[in-house]
Amino acid sequence: MSKNKLSKGQQRRVNANHQRRLKTSKEKPDYDDNLFGEPDEGIVISRFGMHADVESADGDVHRCNIRRTIRSLVTGDRVVWRPGKPAAEGVNVKGIVEAVHERTSVLTRPDFYDGVKPIAANIDQIVIVSAILPELSLNIIDRYLVACETLQIEPIIVLNKIDLLDDEGMAFVNEQMDIYRNIGYRVLMVSSHTQDGLKPLEEALTGRISIFAGQSGVGKSSLLNALLGLQKEILTNDISDNSGLGQHTTTAARLYHFPHGGDVIDSPGVREFGLWHLEPEQITQGFVEFHDYLGLCKYRDCKHDTDPGCAIREAVEEGKIAETRFENYHRILESMAQVKTRKNFSDTDD
């Protein structure tokens, strides 16, 4: 994946924030090694400021401080940590995270002040949760898929609330989902209310670390509750009977274990992936069905719109590429341009 470009104003803010954090870290006292036991392996199940909850190999969770030399630590990181010893006055000292293992993957999102910010590590797959209520939006699904392709993390599309569909509605939704099945994406139809379709989803989650992405109101948290066998541990984003709007809730990112095997990181930071930091070429690459036609256009600088000799547009006209995907591709590019214009205007004020 090519390196994302930041504007001069954004880069100044990133550098300023980094220097501020360095200054703060130098002012913090170091930790006495005599306060801690032998090094052990663990996984970060949650991060709270300068502390992290680390789960050891035996399943116990330990609240730990973080060495100031560690620049980045997020939920899902595999770490070397040391338990705290009982202090003289009988109070246990917090453990300490000593080092972070190399990540197999990292889930990031653009941040206006800190550049591209990591929010979870060592993710195997992203579960894109959509629903027929409050709205089945293929545009939002396509935005998530572009993010997954750019991050090089495997996606699974899960359509929730199928219990609200009659036969005609189910046929229509299946036709819409065939657009994604036909280009190689896995689609699962489920209901967190009736638990229909949960078994295939459980099988897809077993043995992997997943993260669920979905806008408020699609039943993401209710689905997680059903999979985890919980009732209230994860707050729900239910649909209001009167308004049809999702009731917004947030919690800190945390790793949970599925009873059937596998793990999930629940984070409010993946409700929507921002794409404004990407280049147009990265968006194009994020549409997998475009790949066979890239480089075949008449002009090298083809915008894949009304340009003469555009191989991608011709494939759309021939029915080889879904028209809805092509339209959403241009909607994403247009929304990116609008956001970048606003942010560049803001940068001129710095």
From Swiss-Prot:
Key words, A-Z: Cytoplasm, GTP-binding, Hydrolase, Metal-binding, Nucleotide-binding, Ribosome biogenesis, RNA-binding, rRNA-binding, Zinc
Binding of GTP, residues: 160-163, 214-222
Positions annotated to bind Zn(2+): 297, 302, 304, 310
Record Pfam families: RsgA_GTPase
Annotated signal peptide: none
Region called Necessary for GMP-PNP-dependent association with the 30S ribosomal subunit, residue ranges: 1-20
GO molecular function, one term: rRNA binding
Keyword Zinc attributed: yes
Role, per record: One of at least 4 proteins (Era, RbfA, RimM and RsgA/YjeQ) that assist in the late maturation steps of the functional core of the 30S ribosomal subunit. Binds the 30S subunit contacting the head, platform, and rRNA helix 44, which may assist the last maturation stages. Removes RbfA from mature, but not immature 30S ribosomes in a GTP-dependent manner; 95% removal in the presence of GTP, 90% removal in GMP-PNP and 65% removal in the presence of GDP. Circulary permuted GTPase that catalyzes rapid hydrolysis of GTP with a slow catalytic turnover.
Similarity section: Belongs to the TRAFAC class YlqF/YawG GTPase family. RsgA subfamily.
Quaternary data: Monomer. All of the protein is associated with ribosomes; the ratio is substoichiometric at 1:200 RsgA/ribosome. Association is tightest with the 30S subunit in the presence of the non-hydrolyzable GTP analog GMP-PNP. 2 cryoelectron microscopy (cryo-EM) structures in complex with 30S ribosomes have been resolved; the protein is determined to bind to different but partially overlapping regions of the 30S ribosomal subunit. One cryo-EM study suggests it contacts ribosomal proteins uS3, uS12 and uS13 as well as 16S rRNA.
Protein name as annotated: Small ribosomal subunit biogenesis GTPase RsgA
Organism per entry: Escherichia coli (strain K12)
